[in-house]
Amino acid sequence: ISTGEYNKMDQWINGLIKLPFGKSVPLPVSNKDSFDKKRDYIKETLDNMNNAIYGHVEAKTHILQVIGKWIRNPDSLGNVLAIQGPMGNGKTTLIKNGIAKSLNRPFEFVALGGASDSAFFEGHSYTYEGSRWGRIVDILHKCESMNPIICFDELDKVSETAKGDEIINMLIHMTDSSQNSKFQDNYFPGIDIDLSKVLFIFSFNDESKINRILKDRMYVIRTKGYNNKDKLQIAHN
């Protein structure tokens, strides 16, 4: 066996072994905990969001309702959220420093505007020269958990890319609760990768550009831009 072939096999084996099969990060509280502990956790979550970003009261209320549902039913953790709102109003900050911090789960950010095709996420076949696994496996490696929070930014920009439909179809498959427990990376054919516990969060500006099937999977939380009074308050703080 050649050195090149050996290195290729070594990369494949190490990449597979590094996948955190069966590992996940539990919620900081459960339904079995006391009422006071659950109440304190919800208050802490609201404090995290308020410290992360000013305003967005309605959006924060929706997020607290969703987290309350997860406390009651942890098995529903594999969810698809979406934060809609104008550019520059703090959607990503709300997700990273509000939601991810409160859930205490590893967080990864993916800029969809920079994705060229679905292979960016799903990898290339092992037989190709210089092939490797895709971005999703990369994220699982880095997070060392099967239930990270993955934030896909600028979903509405995907339709403007050359292979936008291909990427959207991949996202539809990835967020389908009936089949995302059997996600496969092209680099690891025949090996099921369970994404059912991942929290997918999409952010976008223009809701009219979102694929209808994908949008039906989402719990959409709408945010507004800041008015002059809000901007003065932010500047003062």
Locate predicted features.
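AAA+/P-loop NTPase substrate/partner-engagement loops
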Residues: K101-R132, I139, S159, D230
